[in-house]
Design a protein with these regions (language model features):
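Bacterial N-terminal signal peptides that target proteins for export
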Residues: 1-7
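Hydrophobic helical h-region of N-terminal Sec-dependent signal peptides
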Residues: 10-12
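C-terminal motif of bacterial Sec signal peptides marking the signal peptidase cleavage site
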Residues: 16-19
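Flexible, low-complexity junctional segments that flank or bridge functional domains
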Residues: 21-258, 273, 455-483
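Flexible loop residues that form catalytic
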Residues: 159, 264, 332
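Active-site-proximal loop/turn and secondary-structure-junction residues that shape catalytic pockets
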Residues: 209, 265-267
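C-terminal "post-core" interaction segments
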Residues: 229-231, 235-246, 250-258, 267-483
Length: 483
């Protein structure tokens, strides 16, 4: 799918709709400029357009009725929310932003962050008190400089014990003091007698603009006579696609036998980057269908009738492609969108061995829409910085599989234990060690009958984290005559 063509289509669609509201006598009612952009963007591209009556192409009889409708909403955010389909159950992900520069920075790997990546659990025997554990910290971040490490435990923020009612606002602050704790299992395998006690270690950290390298760790592991490429990849960011090629070139030169792709903490990102990574793992399926796309019926019908290839993304091939017939992928509940896409879309072609816990459950993708003539990032209205990031398509693999609302279940269940995290990339790190055993046909049964109740992770506080998106590319005038 070529987003240049898509944006040209949206431009023409918007112009056709706008022509219905021409006010030749110049006496039409004035409509909010930003609200006008919001409605037209959602009308043109929103995946669930057909489910929202206010987005119907024939919703308004004339420009006065349209303007009156728009002016009923005090803010663009109010209007946007009324156009979302089942916010709590179906569309949890479409967003509107009042500063598209911040959105662009996030999608390129830059965000306001302290570099602390964590999970939250209930305390043993509690349905109210909670604690956090550090999964990893970003290199060079405030958390890294403060020497916070994977496996550290915390129970409070700014001297206030964390509870199910307060953790949201306490961890949302730009600056806060973390109150750390010690975890003890009291030398038993019984979870209910475990304790998490404050230890008087308190560290203040601040969120800053941070460039996050999505490649957290990679290495070639020699294990039981096999060479295994290991990659922890924490966000699908197109700026790092060439870096992925370099890494896989190294794997290829090391003659790796297998790949362990660690997506435990990867909330998603660019569809194009998922295609690149899948093609680096394989390579033998060049031009085969990676995934197909299903848009709202207006857009879908247009492309089916004019250029069905638009709705297909295909595998690529690189000199560094490994041509593997299987891949081991590590997942948790934090693995979402593009992470799930690569699992789902590799399954029709190779053996995908998934280890960990069930993924998040997001199969829809979005695109950034700007207030410009064609919703591209060129000639944007200078009077405001609003942009939309609505869901515009759902993804299906080559076999038509989609709609994994409840996530993708692993073949081998394995959950991290906060008191035995290990170090990322170390062969003794529990989940990696278990996977290495599978690779060498040594399957150890893991007893995990009693586990903590997971609540949330740091992505809760990152508005854009679980986006899966297509890039908004520059429109070239040479393409405008394609329609």
């Amino acid at each position: 799918m070529n987003s240049k063509f898509f944006l040209v289509y949206l431009s023409l669609f918007s112009l056709l709709f706008s022509s219905c509201f021409e006010d030749n006598d110049d006496n039409g009612a004035f409509a909010s400029e930003i609200n006008d952009f919001v409605w037209k963007g959602m009308n043109a591209a929103y995946l669930y357009k057909q489910e929202i009556s206010d987005l119907d192409n024939n919703r308004f009889n004339d420009s006065d009725e349209y303007a009156s409708y728009l002016n009923n909403f005090i803010t663009p955010e109010n209007l946007f929310e009324t156009l979302i389909y089942e916010r709590e159950n179906i569309d949890k992900f479409s967003i509107i932003v009042n500063n598209y520069i911040e959105l662009e920075e996030y999608l390129s790997g830059i965000s306001l962050s302290n570099g602390l990546n964590f999970g939250l659990y209930y305390l043993p025997n509690s349905s109210n008190e909670i604690f956090g554990y550090v999964r990893y910290v970003n290199q060079g971040s405030p958390a890294d400089l403060a020497e916070i490490e994977r496996g550290d435990i915390f129970r409070g923020i700014d001297g206030i014990p964390l509870t199910i009612d307060n953790y949201d606002y306490l961890l949302s602050e730009e600056t806060y003091t973390i109150n750390f704790a010690d975890y003890s299992n009291n030398n038993t395998d019984i979870l209910n007698d475990d304790t998490v006690e404050f230890n008087n270690i308190n560290i203040e950290i601040q969120k800053v603009p941070l460039i996050k390298n999505p490649v957290h760790h990679y290495s070639t592991i020699d294990y039981s006579g096999k060479k295994i490429g290991y990659l922890m990849y924490n966000q699908f960011v197109s700026n790092y696609d060439e870096y992925l090629e370099t890494i896989f070139s190294e794997f290829k030169s090391n003659s790796v036998d297998d790949i362990v792709l660690d997506l435990r903490y990867n909330p998603g990102g660019s569809i194009n980057s998922a295609i690149v990574l899948a093609s680096l793992i394989t390579g033998q399926f060049e031009n085969e269908i990676f995934n197909t796309e299903e848009w709202n019926s207006d857009i879908q019908n247009y492309w089916i009738n004019n250029d069905p290839e638009f709705l297909i993304n295909r595998f690529l091939s690189f000199q560094s492609s490994l041509n593997l017939n299987r891949v081991f992928i590590l997942t948790t509940r934090s693995s979402a969108s593009a992470s799930e896409l690569i699992i789902n879309c590799l399954k029709p072609y190779i053996n995908v061995i998934q280890i960990g816990t069930t993924t998040y459950g997001k199969y829809q993708a979005s695109v950034t829409l700007y207030d410009s003539g064609n919703f591209s990032n060129q000639n944007v209205n200078p009077s405001h910085n609003y942009a939309l990031q609505p869901l515009v398509l759902k993804t299906l693999n080559a076999n038509g599989v989609s709609d994994y609302f409840n996530g993708i279940n692993p073949e081998y269940e394995f959950e991290e234990r906060v008191f035995d995290m290990g170090q990322i990339g170390d062969v003794n790190e529990p989940m990696l060690n278990y996977t290495l055993g599978l690779i060498n046909s040594r399957i150890d049964l893991v007893s995990q009958t009693e586990l903590f109740r997971f609540i949330d992770d740091n992505f809760k506080f990152d508005f854009f984290a679980r986006e899966m998106y297509i890039e908004n590319e520059v429109i070239l005038k040479t393409y405008e005559n394609q329609f």
